[in-house]
Each structure stands twice: as C-alpha cells, then as structure tokens.
C-alpha cells in the first residue's frame, strides 16, 4: 500500500494525496466481529462539548480488534487485509486452525496467506506475539502491553513502533517513536513489527468535505472570536491577539510541558518525548 497523487481536474483535487487502497479487501467486514458505534459529536451526557472539532462523520461499524492475542500456540492464516474507518492502521482478518476468526492490527509487510502465531514459542517474524523478555534487543515491536495480560496499549496507530533497547531484570527499556524511553515489565507481550500504513502521514485531504466525512469539524482561530470565547478574541478591527499564543483556557501553545509532575507513572519514564 502506498499513496496516489491525483490530477488537478478540479480545485479540490489540486494537491490532494490519498491512500492507495487497491490491495485491501473491498467487501463488508466479518459479520461476527463488528458492533455498532454511536457518534456523540464530542458531547458528554449533559450535551456539553468536552472535545472540540468532533462531528458526526460517516456512519461506521466498529471492528472488534484482538489486542490481547489470546489464542496461544494456535497458528493463524491471514485471510485478508482491510481498511478500518475507526483507526489509521490497517487491520488483518485471521483464521485460526481451530476455525475461530479475529481481527488484529496489521504490521508493515504482512500479506494474505501468511501464517502467524501468538505464544512464547513463536518466531521473531512480523505479526507474531510473545513476551518482551524473549524478544532480541533492537527489535521493533508494536501493540505493547503495560500490564501482563491487559492487552496492547502502546504503539497502535499507523507507522508507530517501539524499539527494544535493553533488558534490566524484570523490566525492559523501550524507545517509542515519539522519542520517549520507557520501562515496561518484561512479562508483558508485544507484537513483532512496525504498524502498517506508514504513508498515512503523507495524506492531504484536499477539501473540507473529506474532513467532515471523517468526523472532523472546522477549527476556528482564536483571533476571529469574541473576548468571552477566547483570550485572543475581540479588539477593534483585525488584531493579532496581543499576546503569545494560548489555548482557549490560557495555556501556552508553544512548547509548554503539560504532563503532571507528580504522575505515578513518571518513575517508568527515563526520557520524555521529543514532542512534549
């Protein structure tokens, strides 16, 4: 899977760069592995906006993903790769030898017909899942657990990864794609490989409508608002805001660290993210 550049037939296509999904499954998802997902438009139970820039978007079914890889020691064949509207990564439909099916996040390089397995006897190949203490130093992994048996949490979006840096007793050191270096229990499981859809960062939607299909509403500049709505609002005529850029709640937007200093998980982070 790569990207496709479109010809400038219309103004909205000029500069548009989209994903090439020609190799992905074009039919409906596996019926036994989907559920309904209701869009709340960023509102809570009282109807108050708690997440800005969220809209309805296109109707979608939720694909139930196996983040725990519970079928230990049972080989599974990749039936197909699919697009998932609920995440940036592609997903793979697995068919186990005992007849059960499940969806997993597809790693880069996985293709139809590949055989993968979960368990401590698995080979170091993309898609196989095993404990971190059994994975060689330097290996790229994804879908990493923070608690043994709790299911993968770290590195699940398109193109992300965690690299195993070293092993130290009951912990291992992982370097995340953000630059953060973090301690994780060695008994936690991870899946070998980098998450698929590496070209997702190169996509240019090209028009507002494509953002609305994804459920993204417009972002209004603070200087275009009234003083009651934003610290940059108001003024006579067009103004530049009159202060350093801040959020609607007055927090600096130019590199201010927002992580709490007394957070309990700080002891597991050896180096903070390059991205703040």
UniProtKB/Swiss-Prot annotation:
Basic residues composition bias: residue spans: 254-270
SUPFAM superfamilies membership: Nucleic acid-binding proteins (SSF50249), Translation proteins SH3-like domain (SSF50104)
Domain of life: Bacteria
A GO term, aspect molecular function: transferase activity
Pfam families listed in its UniProt record: Ribosomal_L2, Ribosomal_L2_C
Keyword field contains Chaperone: no
Residue numbers spanned by region Disordered: 224-276
Disulfide bonds: none
Keyword Hydrolase in annotation: no
Any one Gene Ontology BP term: cytoplasmic translation
Keywords: Ribonucleoprotein, Ribosomal protein, RNA-binding, rRNA-binding
Single GO cellular component term: large ribosomal subunit
Family in the record: Belongs to the universal ribosomal protein uL2 family.
SUBUNIT field: Part of the 50S ribosomal subunit. Forms a bridge to the 30S subunit in the 70S ribosome.
Biological function: One of the primary rRNA binding proteins. Required for association of the 30S and 50S subunits to form the 70S ribosome, for tRNA binding and peptide bond formation. It has been suggested to have peptidyltransferase activity; this is somewhat controversial. Makes several contacts with the 16S rRNA in the 70S ribosome.
HAMAP family cross-referenced by the UniProt entry: Ribosomal_uL2_B
Protein's name according to its UniProt entry: Large ribosomal subunit protein uL2
Organism: Ehrlichia ruminantium (strain Gardel)
